[in-house]
Amino acid sequence: MIRTIGRNRILASLGLAVSLALVVGISGCRVHVDKDENGDEKKVQVDTPFGGVHVNTDQTTAADLGLPVYPGATEIKGDDKHKSADVHLGFGEWELRVRAVSYGSSDSEEKVTAFYKKALTRYGDVITCNGKSPVGTPTMTSEGLNCTDNGNNNPNVKFDNGDFNIDTGKIQLKAGSKRHQHIVGFEDPKDGQTRFALVSLDLPDVVDNKSGSSD
């Protein structure tokens, strides 16, 4: 089972997921959809006896991710690409959660970077990455997270940075472990604003068939 994780892909596939649940007519299946004033899906829940998919859009904040908002920064809204999202998939022991929100600030990227380098220390060591390459030290957190760990190392998950407005050609800050990551990523500035995304990843457990251990 491979899940491609990206806000745009998730939001676009919600209608299909709901339709399939209704067509299949799974016993005990429950579908609940809340729409905003424009008729767009804001909250979708699909629950079955085997698990469920819960998606909330435009309701996630930095506090939900366990991070502060940069002083004076404002949430970027107004298009699908920058909608905040809280996505939870659970099927038996297979659990995945992704939360993301984008902000803009009139301050420089350097100031925002310095702020979040300090804020991320609540989750342990903080590494700085440019793409998959470390910048400075440390190059790995004490829990084993490095710049190549972006969710795609998990065979059950494909994480698309672009869908969360994280430019792989720009600086990213990371803290945590391979399974539980907090990321601050930057995109190209626009309208005089430094734009950045806050992302938390809780990835499903992966067992090493050779060692029997999990990441």
Give the predicted meaning of each segment.
Residues 13-25:
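Bacterial N-terminal signal peptides
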Residues 2, 8, 25, 29-215:
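An acidic-aromatic pocket/loop used at catalytic or ligand-binding sites
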